[in-house]
Structure formats: structure tokens, C-alpha cells
Amino acid sequence: MGFRKLLVAFVKPTCGLRVFLFMAELFETNSEPPVYRVIPVLELAEDPLDPVIQPSGSTLKSVANPLVLIRPCVRIIFSIGEWLFGFAVLMIGLSVLAAMPVLQFLSLGYLLEAGGRVARTGRLRDGFIGVRLAARLGGLVLGCWLILLPLRLVSDLAYSAQIIDPGGRTAAAWRIGLFVLMGLSGLHVGMACARGGRLRYFLWPFNFIWVIRRLLRGGYYSEARDIVWDTARSLRLPYYFSLGLRGFLGAFAWLVLPVTLLALGRLPAPLAPLVGLLGGLLLALVLIYLPCLQMRLAMKNRLSAVFEFREARRNFQRAPWAFAVAFVATLLFALPLYLLKIEFVPREAAWLPSLVFITFIFPARLFTGWSLGLAIHRAVPRHWFFRWTGRLPFVPVAGLYVLIVFFTQYTSWNGVWSLYEQHAFLVPVPFFGM
């Protein structure tokens, strides 16, 4: 209250009242009662009440909800696991496609698109295309495979019972149980796919309840149709096939003459060694420029880009050492597959060498795309010192690769035809070899 009195003491009356600070006497100059101007006064509030203070003997503690901290960590772990699973599924899928005639171009097209996208954006993470979608499709396939395991077991038991006691009651019971399990398994797979096809839906036995409720709301058919159609379009199969075919034709156009001359060097003719040597020199020269040219085709999405020789030289001048690293990685990662071609691989296991091919070539494509993107985003060439020193790894690495390729015709199962199996730029198993 003392503060309020002090505040009023500073206010001057509107008529006839003088206030002397710090004095109690008021001297009136007019007999009329003084009129004071009313001003708002902010009362000092007491200190806000503290939170409820627990008794000293209380054992309660204010602890944050642990779920708030656990849930983000769990989501991050599941997201990383889903990405890794999708990447593994993607590699296996590309390996299977690479071992199949004609469909090989889908695998090659994906590898070129991955490198081309990195070249356009300059970011390596953009080369991992469709990993989440691959995880979704891989979960669907894995769920169907898990559901079919009991069915295969019962089928084997029914077959064994039929062999032991043909026409007996035990064999008939197993056969009836097999048909019942087939119906239930098919129904469960259908309900899991109708709900979304995630892996967890295959492990949940009551999907039919959700499907019935969704059907009662209406519009399920049109929604499911649109989702399936959008998923099929997102795969971009015609685009990958077209890009892979054009990448194959462009690379083969550069390789066919040097490889043919190298193969002719094996003939029993006087000039055959010279022809083979000329083919080896031309092949080494082509190998120096072909990774950049083929990646330019993927980046520009046109076949004529694979013949833009001068543009490839300009790109090299802007990022010489990046191209050198990508070139060494491309040829070095292509060597392991030659070891797998020494022995004939059965058709059923043809995807295993393809898996080795995809595992090694995919990083090489990403590095080549990254080097091209680095060159595109630079306006001026690098210093002459880096340009000339960046050329040093090309000649010895290309010469060593040509030497290894020349001797593969004596170790490979396909003989001289193995010279045309340039899987560093073509498909892992050539189309004519199937």
C-alpha cells in the first residue's frame, strides 16, 4: 500500500491543489474540493504460487514419459531397417532380371538411370531409386513365402502318406487337410494383399475384419485399382527398358570394332598379331571415354549423347581426378565377374554371377555419375596441373584391363565370344549368350 500512496503523491490535481513531494502538508488555494484525475494503478500482485510442493517424506518423482523418448528411436531403427531390406531386395531383383533374356535391359537401364540422376543432381543419395518401393514389394513376396511354408510341409506329409498307404484313411485325411489348408492360405494371402501387402499383415490372422469394414464403407474397388495402377506406373518399366536398350546399343557401337579386331588376332595368319594389337590399342582408347559417354546418354536421355566425344573431354577438364577415380572403379569392379566365367554356370544359378555384377557395378555407376555431375556444376576447367596428373591413371589401368580381357578368351567357358562380354558397359550375360 505504501507504493500506492507514493504514486498518488506524484499526480497533480486538476484545480486548486498543490502537492509537495515528500511532505504531508497540503496548501489549498481554492475552497472548491479538489478533483483528481483518475489514472489506472497497477497493483502489485503477490508472488505467484509455486507449484505444489510435495511433502519432504514423499517418494514421488517427476519423471518424463519414457514412450516420448523411445518412439522416435524405434521409428528411426525401423526406417533404417526398412531401407536396408529394400536395398537388398533391389539388388536381388536386379540380379534376377540381369540373368533373364531381354529383361536384362531393365537391369542395365536402372543402373544407367541411377548414375544419370546422380549426374543431374550432383547428390549420391539420389542414385538409390525406389528403395522404399522395393521394400514394400519384397515384404509382400516374403510374406507369401512364409505363408506357403506350412502348406509345403503338409504337402510333403500327404505325399509320403500316399506312398506308404495308397488309398488308406491316413492318406485321405492328409489330403483333405491339405486342401483345407490351401483354401485358408489362399484366403489369408488375399486378405493381406487387400489390406496393403505389408509384411506385418501376413502375420496378423484377422485381416478379413478390416476388409469387411472397408467394403461396407464403399469405394474400395476404385481405390485399390488406382493404388495398383499408380504402383505399376511408378516402376517405369518401359522407360528403364528403353534406356537400357539404348545404353547397350551405344556402348556396343563403340566396342564392336576394337573387340572384333582383338578377336581376329587369334587367327593363324601372318598379320593376325598386328590386327590383334591394333584392336587392343583401340579398345584401350575406347575404354577411356566410354564411361563418361554412356553416362551422358543416361543424363541427357538421348542416344546421340553417347557420341559427343568433345563434350566428354570438356567434362574431364572440369573434374579430372573425379573421372580418374570413377574410371579405375569401373574397370576394377568389373574384374571379379571374369573369374566366375571360368566354369559354366547352370541356368538355374545364373543370377548368382549377376548378383556379383550388380554389387560391384552399381557403385561404379554412381561414382561415374557423381564425377559427371561435379564437372557439369563447375563453370571453368581445373588447373592444368590437375588436368595432366589426372590423366596418369587412365593409360596403365586401361592397358591392364585390355590384357586381362585378352586372356579371358582362353579361360572363359565361351572362348573367344567372351571378348564381347564387356559387362562393365553391357549386360552381365550377353543376349546372344543365352
Each PLM stretch: what is its role?
Residues 340-351:
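Charged, glycine-enriched surface loops/patches
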Residues 6-11:
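Short polybasic linear motifs
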Residues 24-291, 296-342, 362-434:
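Helix-coil boundary and N-terminal low-complexity module in membrane systems
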Residues 349-362:
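Short alpha-helical packing/oligomerization segments
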